[in-house]
Amino acid sequence: MASALRPPRVPKPKGVLPSHYYESFLEKKGPCDRDYKKFWAGLQGLTIYFYNSNRDFQHVEKLNLGAFEKLTDEIPWGSSRDPGTHFSLILRDQEIKFKVETLECREMWKGFILTVVELRVPTDLTLLPGHLYMMSEVLAKEEARRALETPSCFLKVSRLEAQLLLERYPECGNLLLRPSGDGADGVSVTTRQMHNGTHVVRHYKVKREGPKYVIDVEQPFSCTSLDAVVNYFVSHTKKALVPFLLDEDYEKVLGYVEADKENGENVWVAPSAPGPGPAPCTGGPKPLSPASSQDKLPPLPPLPNQEENYVTPIGDGPAVDYENQDVASSSWPVILKPKKLPKPPAKLPKPPVGPKPEPKVFNGGLGRKLPVSSAQPLFPTAGLADMTAELQKKLEKRRALEH
């Protein structure tokens, strides 16, 4: 018998390695780290991505350069001279230290970071002409990317909301872009600065004229993108104005590192989110919370003129409105009045008495059994017939009193 044909094995699709402006091995030490940790790092846009290896597709950390302040060369602790392999990246709220293998690698990292942050090729670094050409190409790519990208300090808020954001989060910046209030295809710039102990809030108008943005000041200035508008305000105020950037250093997708069984490499795995459970039934009874020791007391009656939805306990019957009826005591059994009772028989038949259980025979004898045709529903005791007759007499007396 021929074995069943199996479909051909499809090779597992491999992800595409991310592209970066510049990438190399980089050792990083954050404010809370005790020692340096080695990563494969890549610069793309205004973000540095960190990977466990140069063959990983998913980053494990990232660092936003939106709050960039400056770069400085770092001399290792206990060393009398600069080995040319340490530098520090100072942001608005933290300082990160880096360590590379060579002086050339350090200058390359500093040059590419300054290129994307300041949108210019630095000229005060120890770089070769080929390095400067690479940075000029990155500058053109970054300018094209920002022309199509909305700055991070642009928020869809009103004028009042912009003022409140700058007031509530002063550590996040003091310059914010927002849609124009006149409904035109332009933007407005809101700033908040301290002057003589008083916070001063100012608003600037930016008009849209074709593909360009014109800043409406004494000498109108034309910009090719919104990012250029932000750079104009930052550069013309000697960096006194800082773009507003809320802290968003938290990931939205859960992931973990797992070793690939085929090649042994570490890969980043993002498990699929579990689907939502069944929706609770709105029309059904509400679940009862576990009762405490104080809930064992009988519930109090509801207050008048209050509309509350609550669940009636099982042991409590609904209130009954009685109209021209005798209310029976709770200690006596309540007999419901039927609409029409049949005439009682002249004499109640005596209920048959059930047979006694047959004695067990241990010596092999057989006990006698009743015929099957004589099996009838039996009363448990003979006293139940007397109680039925007594209730019947009471019912006849009540009917006589009513008539």
Swiss-Prot record:
Biased composition (Pro residues): 343-356
Subunit structure: Interacts with PTK6 and CSF1R.
Domain PH as annotated: residue spans: 18-130
Effect of Y22F: Small decrease in tyrosine phosphorylation
Entry comment describing in which tissues the protein is expressed: Widely expressed.
Function: Substrate of protein kinase PTK6. May play a regulatory role in the acute-phase response in systemic inflammation and may modulate STAT3 activity.
Subcellular location: Cytoplasm
Spans annotated as Disordered: 270-308, 331-374
GO MF annotations in UniProt: signaling adaptor activity
Entry GO CC: cytosol; plasma membrane
SUPFAM superfamilies registered for this protein in UniProt: PH domain-like, SH2 domain
UniProt keyword Coiled coil present: yes
Predominant localisation class: cytoplasm
Keyword Acetylation listed: no
Species annotation: Homo sapiens
Coiled-coil parts of chain: 382-402
Name of the coding gene: STAP2
Domain named SH2: residues: 133-248
List of residues that carry Phosphotyrosine: Y22, Y250, Y310, Y322
Protein name (record): Signal-transducing adaptor protein 2
